[in-house]
Amino acid sequence: MANVTLVTGFLLMGFSNIQKLRILYGVLFLLIYLAALMSNLLIITLITLDVKLQTPMYFFLKNLSFLDVFLVSVPIPKFIVNNLTHNNSISILGCAFQLLLMTSFSAGEIFILTAMSYDRYVAICCPLNYEVIMNTGVCVLMASVSWAIGGLFGTAYTAGTFSMPFCGSSVIPQFFCDVPSLLRISCSETLMVIYAGIGVGACLSISCFICIVISYIYIFSTVLKIPTTKGQSKAFSTCFPHLTVFTVFIITAYFVYLKPPSNSPSVIDRLLSVIYTVMPPVFNPVTYSLRNNDMKCALIRLLQKTYGQEAYFI
Protein backbone atom coordinates (compact mmCIF):
# COMPACT_ATOMS: atom_id res chain seq x y z
CA MET A 1 0.00 0.00 0.00
CA ALA A 2 3.01 2.36 0.44
CA ASN A 3 3.43 2.86 -3.32
CA VAL A 4 -0.27 3.24 -4.04
CA THR A 5 -1.56 6.71 -4.87
CA LEU A 6 -4.85 7.43 -3.18
CA VAL A 7 -7.62 8.98 -5.25
CA THR A 8 -8.58 12.55 -4.27
CA GLY A 9 -11.28 13.05 -6.89
CA PHE A 10 -13.16 11.22 -9.62
CA LEU A 11 -13.87 11.55 -13.33
CA LEU A 12 -17.38 10.65 -14.50
CA MET A 13 -16.98 8.95 -17.87
CA GLY A 14 -20.49 9.69 -19.18
CA PHE A 15 -21.43 8.32 -22.58
CA SER A 16 -18.96 9.76 -25.06
CA ASN A 17 -15.71 11.71 -25.41
CA ILE A 18 -16.77 13.22 -28.75
CA GLN A 19 -17.58 16.91 -28.27
CA LYS A 20 -20.62 17.06 -30.55
CA LEU A 21 -22.14 13.96 -28.98
CA ARG A 22 -21.51 15.34 -25.49
CA ILE A 23 -23.40 18.51 -26.36
CA LEU A 24 -26.19 16.43 -27.90
CA TYR A 25 -26.44 14.29 -24.75
CA GLY A 26 -26.41 17.42 -22.60
CA VAL A 27 -29.29 19.01 -24.52
CA LEU A 28 -31.25 15.73 -24.66
CA PHE A 29 -30.97 15.16 -20.92
CA LEU A 30 -31.85 18.80 -20.27
CA LEU A 31 -35.13 18.33 -22.15
CA ILE A 32 -35.85 15.07 -20.32
CA TYR A 33 -35.03 16.69 -16.99
CA LEU A 34 -37.35 19.64 -17.66
CA ALA A 35 -40.14 17.26 -18.68
CA ALA A 36 -39.73 15.24 -15.48
CA LEU A 37 -39.52 18.38 -13.37
CA MET A 38 -42.59 20.08 -14.85
CA SER A 39 -44.80 16.98 -14.88
CA ASN A 40 -44.06 16.11 -11.25
CA LEU A 41 -44.39 19.71 -10.09
CA LEU A 42 -47.75 19.87 -11.88
CA ILE A 43 -48.95 16.82 -9.94
CA ILE A 44 -47.73 18.36 -6.67
CA THR A 45 -49.49 21.63 -7.50
CA LEU A 46 -52.79 19.96 -8.44
CA ILE A 47 -52.88 17.79 -5.32
CA THR A 48 -51.95 20.72 -3.08
CA LEU A 49 -54.49 23.19 -4.50
CA ASP A 50 -57.46 20.95 -5.34
CA VAL A 51 -59.68 20.10 -2.37
CA LYS A 52 -61.08 17.00 -4.09
CA LEU A 53 -57.60 15.48 -4.23
CA GLN A 54 -57.04 15.74 -0.48
CA THR A 55 -57.20 11.96 0.01
CA PRO A 56 -54.63 9.42 1.26
CA MET A 57 -54.01 8.07 -2.24
CA TYR A 58 -53.07 11.47 -3.61
CA PHE A 59 -51.18 12.38 -0.44
CA PHE A 60 -48.82 9.47 -1.08
CA LEU A 61 -48.70 10.30 -4.79
CA LYS A 62 -47.57 13.83 -3.89
CA ASN A 63 -44.81 12.38 -1.72
CA LEU A 64 -43.79 10.11 -4.60
CA SER A 65 -43.64 13.11 -6.94
CA PHE A 66 -41.45 15.01 -4.48
CA LEU A 67 -39.09 12.04 -4.29
CA ASP A 68 -39.03 11.80 -8.10
CA VAL A 69 -38.11 15.49 -8.37
CA PHE A 70 -35.30 15.10 -5.85
CA LEU A 71 -34.08 11.80 -7.33
CA VAL A 72 -33.78 13.11 -10.88
CA SER A 73 -32.27 16.41 -9.67
CA VAL A 74 -29.26 14.73 -8.04
CA PRO A 75 -27.38 13.24 -11.04
CA ILE A 76 -28.90 14.85 -14.14
CA PRO A 77 -27.99 18.57 -13.65
CA LYS A 78 -24.39 17.59 -12.90
CA PHE A 79 -24.32 15.39 -16.01
CA ILE A 80 -25.75 18.22 -18.14
CA VAL A 81 -23.16 20.71 -16.85
CA ASN A 82 -20.34 18.21 -17.38
CA ASN A 83 -21.34 17.66 -21.00
CA LEU A 84 -21.81 21.33 -21.84
CA THR A 85 -18.62 22.49 -20.08
CA HIS A 86 -16.50 19.45 -21.03
CA ASN A 87 -15.52 18.96 -17.39
CA ASN A 88 -16.06 15.46 -16.00
CA SER A 89 -14.52 15.95 -12.58
CA ILE A 90 -16.31 15.50 -9.26
CA SER A 91 -14.77 15.74 -5.80
CA ILE A 92 -14.90 12.89 -3.29
CA LEU A 93 -17.23 14.99 -1.14
CA GLY A 94 -19.47 15.69 -4.13
CA CYS A 95 -19.50 12.01 -5.04
CA ALA A 96 -20.38 11.02 -1.46
CA PHE A 97 -23.14 13.64 -1.34
CA GLN A 98 -24.53 12.38 -4.66
CA LEU A 99 -24.53 8.77 -3.47
CA LEU A 100 -26.13 9.75 -0.14
CA LEU A 101 -29.02 11.59 -1.78
CA MET A 102 -29.65 9.01 -4.49
CA THR A 103 -29.74 6.04 -2.11
CA SER A 104 -31.88 7.99 0.39
CA PHE A 105 -34.47 9.06 -2.18
CA SER A 106 -34.47 5.62 -3.82
CA ALA A 107 -35.10 3.87 -0.50
CA GLY A 108 -37.75 6.46 0.32
CA GLU A 109 -39.53 5.71 -2.96
CA ILE A 110 -39.65 1.99 -2.20
CA PHE A 111 -41.27 2.62 1.18
CA ILE A 112 -43.72 5.19 -0.21
CA LEU A 113 -44.74 2.71 -2.91
CA THR A 114 -45.26 0.10 -0.18
CA ALA A 115 -47.44 2.55 1.76
CA MET A 116 -49.44 3.20 -1.42
CA SER A 117 -50.11 -0.52 -1.83
CA TYR A 118 -51.41 -0.68 1.75
CA ASP A 119 -53.64 2.31 1.03
CA ARG A 120 -55.11 0.53 -2.01
CA TYR A 121 -55.58 -2.63 0.07
CA VAL A 122 -57.57 -0.77 2.74
CA ALA A 123 -59.59 1.17 0.13
CA ILE A 124 -60.66 -1.97 -1.75
CA CYS A 125 -60.75 -4.64 0.96
CA CYS A 126 -61.98 -2.52 3.90
CA PRO A 127 -63.93 0.35 2.27
CA LEU A 128 -66.26 0.94 5.24
CA ASN A 129 -63.33 1.53 7.60
CA TYR A 130 -61.11 3.32 5.08
CA GLU A 131 -61.41 6.83 6.53
CA VAL A 132 -60.87 5.54 10.06
CA ILE A 133 -57.82 3.42 9.22
CA MET A 134 -56.19 5.82 6.75
CA ASN A 135 -56.70 9.00 8.76
CA THR A 136 -54.45 12.03 8.42
CA GLY A 137 -52.23 11.05 11.34
CA VAL A 138 -51.59 7.57 9.96
CA CYS A 139 -50.79 8.89 6.48
CA VAL A 140 -48.36 11.50 7.81
CA LEU A 141 -46.71 8.87 10.03
CA MET A 142 -46.30 6.40 7.15
CA ALA A 143 -44.83 9.07 4.89
CA SER A 144 -42.51 10.38 7.62
CA VAL A 145 -41.23 6.89 8.40
CA SER A 146 -40.62 6.28 4.68
CA TRP A 147 -38.52 9.44 4.37
CA ALA A 148 -36.70 8.76 7.65
CA ILE A 149 -35.80 5.15 6.84
CA GLY A 150 -34.65 6.23 3.39
CA GLY A 151 -32.38 8.86 4.94
CA LEU A 152 -30.96 6.45 7.53
CA PHE A 153 -30.29 3.78 4.92
CA GLY A 154 -28.67 6.29 2.57
CA THR A 155 -26.44 7.59 5.37
CA ALA A 156 -25.33 4.12 6.46
CA TYR A 157 -24.82 2.96 2.86
CA THR A 158 -22.73 6.02 1.97
CA ALA A 159 -20.69 5.89 5.19
CA GLY A 160 -19.88 2.24 4.55
CA THR A 161 -18.87 2.93 0.96
CA PHE A 162 -16.59 5.88 1.74
CA SER A 163 -14.97 4.17 4.71
CA MET A 164 -12.91 2.37 2.06
CA PRO A 165 -9.79 3.92 0.50
CA PHE A 166 -9.77 4.41 -3.28
CA CYS A 167 -6.62 4.03 -5.33
CA GLY A 168 -5.48 3.46 -8.88
CA SER A 169 -7.87 4.70 -11.55
CA SER A 170 -10.08 7.67 -10.67
CA VAL A 171 -12.44 7.05 -13.59
CA ILE A 172 -16.05 6.14 -12.78
CA PRO A 173 -17.59 4.50 -15.88
CA GLN A 174 -21.00 6.06 -15.24
CA PHE A 175 -22.63 9.49 -15.44
CA PHE A 176 -23.08 9.55 -11.65
CA CYS A 177 -21.43 8.01 -8.58
CA ASP A 178 -22.73 4.52 -7.92
CA VAL A 179 -21.49 1.78 -5.62
CA PRO A 180 -20.59 -0.86 -8.27
CA SER A 181 -18.28 1.65 -9.97
CA LEU A 182 -16.70 2.69 -6.66
CA LEU A 183 -16.10 -0.95 -5.73
CA ARG A 184 -14.03 -1.39 -8.88
CA ILE A 185 -11.55 1.29 -7.81
CA SER A 186 -11.45 0.42 -4.13
CA CYS A 187 -8.13 -0.82 -2.78
CA SER A 188 -9.64 -2.13 0.43
CA GLU A 189 -8.78 -5.74 1.22
CA THR A 190 -12.16 -6.33 2.84
CA LEU A 191 -15.51 -5.20 1.50
CA MET A 192 -17.62 -6.65 4.30
CA VAL A 193 -19.04 -3.26 5.28
CA ILE A 194 -20.35 -2.41 1.84
CA TYR A 195 -21.61 -5.93 1.17
CA ALA A 196 -23.45 -5.77 4.49
CA GLY A 197 -25.07 -2.55 3.25
CA ILE A 198 -26.03 -4.22 -0.01
CA GLY A 199 -27.49 -7.12 1.98
CA VAL A 200 -29.56 -4.77 4.13
CA GLY A 201 -30.79 -3.00 1.00
CA ALA A 202 -31.76 -6.31 -0.56
CA CYS A 203 -33.63 -7.36 2.60
CA LEU A 204 -35.53 -4.07 2.76
CA SER A 205 -36.45 -4.28 -0.93
CA ILE A 206 -37.57 -7.91 -0.64
CA SER A 207 -39.62 -7.10 2.48
CA CYS A 208 -41.38 -4.26 0.67
CA PHE A 209 -41.90 -6.49 -2.35
CA ILE A 210 -43.48 -9.21 -0.20
CA CYS A 211 -45.78 -6.67 1.49
CA ILE A 212 -46.91 -5.37 -1.89
CA VAL A 213 -47.47 -8.87 -3.29
CA ILE A 214 -49.56 -9.86 -0.26
CA SER A 215 -51.57 -6.64 -0.57
CA TYR A 216 -52.33 -7.33 -4.21
CA ILE A 217 -53.29 -10.94 -3.57
CA TYR A 218 -56.00 -9.69 -1.24
CA ILE A 219 -56.90 -6.85 -3.62
CA PHE A 220 -57.31 -9.09 -6.66
CA SER A 221 -59.29 -11.69 -4.74
CA THR A 222 -61.65 -8.94 -3.53
CA VAL A 223 -61.96 -7.26 -6.93
CA LEU A 224 -62.82 -10.53 -8.66
CA LYS A 225 -65.79 -10.87 -6.30
CA ILE A 226 -67.28 -7.58 -7.53
CA PRO A 227 -70.36 -8.56 -9.59
CA THR A 228 -70.10 -5.88 -12.29
CA THR A 229 -67.39 -5.52 -14.91
CA LYS A 230 -67.50 -1.75 -14.51
CA GLY A 231 -66.78 -2.05 -10.80
CA GLN A 232 -63.88 -4.40 -11.42
CA SER A 233 -62.45 -2.11 -14.08
CA LYS A 234 -62.63 0.92 -11.78
CA ALA A 235 -60.90 -0.96 -8.96
CA PHE A 236 -58.17 -2.31 -11.23
CA SER A 237 -57.58 1.14 -12.74
CA THR A 238 -56.44 2.46 -9.35
CA CYS A 239 -54.05 -0.47 -8.82
CA PHE A 240 -52.32 -1.13 -12.13
CA PRO A 241 -50.47 2.23 -12.32
CA HIS A 242 -48.97 1.64 -8.88
CA LEU A 243 -48.04 -1.95 -9.69
CA THR A 244 -46.42 -0.91 -12.97
CA VAL A 245 -44.42 1.89 -11.35
CA PHE A 246 -43.17 -0.36 -8.54
CA THR A 247 -42.16 -3.17 -10.92
CA VAL A 248 -40.13 -0.86 -13.17
CA PHE A 249 -38.48 0.88 -10.22
CA ILE A 250 -37.52 -2.23 -8.25
CA ILE A 251 -36.12 -4.08 -11.29
CA THR A 252 -33.94 -1.18 -12.45
CA ALA A 253 -32.82 -0.43 -8.87
CA TYR A 254 -31.77 -4.05 -8.46
CA PHE A 255 -29.57 -3.99 -11.56
CA VAL A 256 -27.98 -0.68 -10.56
CA TYR A 257 -27.31 -1.27 -6.86
CA LEU A 258 -27.59 -4.95 -5.98
CA LYS A 259 -26.06 -6.85 -8.86
CA PRO A 260 -22.45 -8.02 -8.42
CA PRO A 261 -19.98 -5.55 -9.94
CA SER A 262 -18.34 -6.65 -13.18
CA ASN A 263 -14.72 -5.97 -14.05
CA SER A 264 -15.65 -4.21 -17.28
CA PRO A 265 -18.85 -2.14 -17.24
CA SER A 266 -20.94 -2.52 -20.38
CA VAL A 267 -23.23 -0.23 -22.33
CA ILE A 268 -26.14 -2.13 -20.77
CA ASP A 269 -24.94 -1.07 -17.29
CA ARG A 270 -25.08 2.59 -18.30
CA LEU A 271 -28.42 2.14 -20.03
CA LEU A 272 -29.90 0.57 -16.89
CA SER A 273 -28.58 3.49 -14.86
CA VAL A 274 -30.31 5.92 -17.21
CA ILE A 275 -33.56 3.96 -16.99
CA TYR A 276 -33.30 3.87 -13.19
CA THR A 277 -32.60 7.59 -12.73
CA VAL A 278 -34.65 9.09 -15.56
CA MET A 279 -37.52 6.70 -16.31
CA PRO A 280 -39.42 6.72 -12.96
CA PRO A 281 -39.60 10.55 -12.68
CA VAL A 282 -40.78 10.81 -16.31
CA PHE A 283 -42.86 7.64 -16.35
CA ASN A 284 -44.70 8.04 -13.02
CA PRO A 285 -46.66 11.22 -13.84
CA VAL A 286 -47.77 9.75 -17.17
CA THR A 287 -48.76 6.45 -15.57
CA TYR A 288 -50.77 8.04 -12.79
CA SER A 289 -52.35 10.83 -14.84
CA LEU A 290 -52.98 9.47 -18.32
CA ARG A 291 -56.19 7.59 -17.40
CA ASN A 292 -56.92 9.36 -14.13
CA ASN A 293 -60.12 11.38 -14.45
CA ASP A 294 -59.62 13.01 -11.04
CA MET A 295 -56.29 14.49 -12.15
CA LYS A 296 -57.74 15.61 -15.48
CA CYS A 297 -60.68 17.31 -13.77
CA ALA A 298 -58.33 18.96 -11.27
CA LEU A 299 -56.23 20.31 -14.15
CA ILE A 300 -59.35 21.71 -15.85
CA ARG A 301 -60.44 23.38 -12.61
CA LEU A 302 -56.98 24.90 -12.18
CA LEU A 303 -57.01 26.21 -15.76
CA GLN A 304 -60.47 27.65 -15.23
CA LYS A 305 -59.32 29.52 -12.14
CA THR A 306 -56.28 30.79 -14.00
CA TYR A 307 -57.66 31.57 -17.46
CA GLY A 308 -61.44 31.53 -16.99
CA GLN A 309 -64.03 29.50 -18.91
CA GLU A 310 -61.79 29.37 -22.00
CA ALA A 311 -60.04 26.45 -20.26
CA TYR A 312 -62.91 24.21 -21.37
CA PHE A 313 -61.62 24.46 -24.93
CA ILE A 314 -57.96 23.81 -24.22
Curated annotation (Swiss-Prot):
Glycosylation sites: 3, 83
Keywords: Cell membrane, Disulfide bond, G-protein coupled receptor, Glycoprotein, Membrane, Olfaction, Receptor, Sensory transduction, Transducer, Transmembrane, Transmembrane helix
Pfam families: 7tm_4
Ranges that cross the membrane: 27-47, 56-76, 92-112, 137-157, 194-214, 238-258, 268-290
GO MF entries: G protein-coupled receptor activity; odorant binding; olfactory receptor activity
Cysteines joined through disulfide linkages: 95-177
A Gene Ontology cellular-component term: plasma membrane
Ranges facing Extracellular side: 1-26, 77-91, 158-193, 259-267
CDD domains per UniProt: 7tmA_OR14-like
Protein location: Cell membrane
Membrane topology: Multi-pass membrane protein
Tree of life domain: Eukaryota
Sequence ranges on the Cytoplasmic membrane side: 48-55, 113-136, 215-237, 291-314
Family according to the record: Belongs to the G-protein coupled receptor 1 family.
Protein name (Swiss-Prot/TrEMBL): Olfactory receptor 14A2
Gene: OR14A2
